[in-house]
Swiss-Prot record:
This is tRNA pseudouridine synthase A. GO terms for molecular function: RNA binding; tRNA pseudouridine(38-40) synthase activity. It comes from the Bacteria. The active site is at residue 52. The gene is truA. Formation of pseudouridine at positions 38, 39 and 40 in the anticodon stem and loop of transfer RNAs. It is an enzyme of class 5 (isomerase). It comes from Pelagibacter ubique (strain HTCC1062). Belongs to the tRNA pseudouridine synthase TruA family.
Length: 246
């Protein structure tokens, strides 16, 4: 048995998410079907995590096993991309890995990025690649709030009701916020995240930056561990899985 890692870029707008579901198109299925066809055996593609419907990836990581060693990885990559590029998916690389490697369990850190367009006009070049917010946001207050998210804590406030993670305890390694010409990028780094955690944190940071909440209220909401107190999650279109670190 041979194991291979696949690095993937995709626009999630027209997909039900990464994972195969009973209805709708998934990124996992699109690639898995093509791999099985070209390798002439049934393969299962295992991702580093599940991105929700509408969420994009700059570099998703996955792996698959096959019975025969692949002799020409570049040829396989080109063949797959020929059929999936027009669907908004690109395979960036295919690498041979040890059988000990696991796209999900071997991950040391995951990095997500959220983009906000804080300006009057909607984006055209990056349509459906960010959250358009007209009201001026207080970036400095947002940065102060982001520090309250750091460290190991119970993130139940930001956990979707459908989340099946065993524990709500996560360790947020870093939250970095950059703003230039109305474009705001918020980067989150942690070993793993709860379902809708990033979008819920962004939604709550927006409430803070709009002065709907003050820092005291923001911290209270975090510590409450009550989903009902959380601000509405930010839309999926602004979220990107940026990188998985092993």
């Amino acid at each position: 048995m041979f194991r291979y890692q696949v690095l993937i870029e995709y626009i999630g707008t027209n997909f039900v998410g990464w994972q195969i579901q009973s209805k709708g198109k998934s990124i996992q299925k699109e690639i898995q079907v093509k791999l099985s066809k070209f390798l002439k055996e049934k393969v299962v593609l295992i991702g580093s995590g599940r991105t929700d419907a509408g969420v994009h990836a700059i570099e998703q990581s996955a792996h698959f096993d096959c019975k025969k060693e692949i002799q020409n990885l570049d040829k396989l990559l080109k063949s797959i991309n020929h059929f999936i590029n027009d669907k908004g998916i690109s395979v960036l690389a295919i690498k041979k890995r040890s059988l000990k490697f696991h796209a999900r369990h071997s991950a040391k850190q995951r990095i997500y990025k959220y983009i906000i367009f804080n300006r009057l006009s909607k984006p055209s070049l990056e349509k459906e690649r960010g959250w358009h917010i007209i009201k001026k946001l207080d970036i400095e207050l947002m940065k102060k709030g982001s520090k309250k998210l750091l460290g190991t804590k119970d993130f139940s406030t930001f956990r979707a009701s459908s989340c099946n993670a065993k524990s709500p305890i996560k360790t947020m390694k870093s939250v970095n916020i950059k703003s230039k010409d109305g474009r705001i990028e918020i980067q989150f780094k942690s070993q793993s995240f709860l379902q809708q955690q990033v979008r819920s944190m962004v939604g709550s940071l927006k409430y803070l930056a709009e002065n709907k909440w003050d820092l005291k209220k923001f911290e209270f909401v975090i510590k409450s561990k009550k989903r009902i107190l959380c601000a509405p999650p930010a839309p999926a279109e602004g979220l990107f899985l940026e990188k998985v670190i092993y």
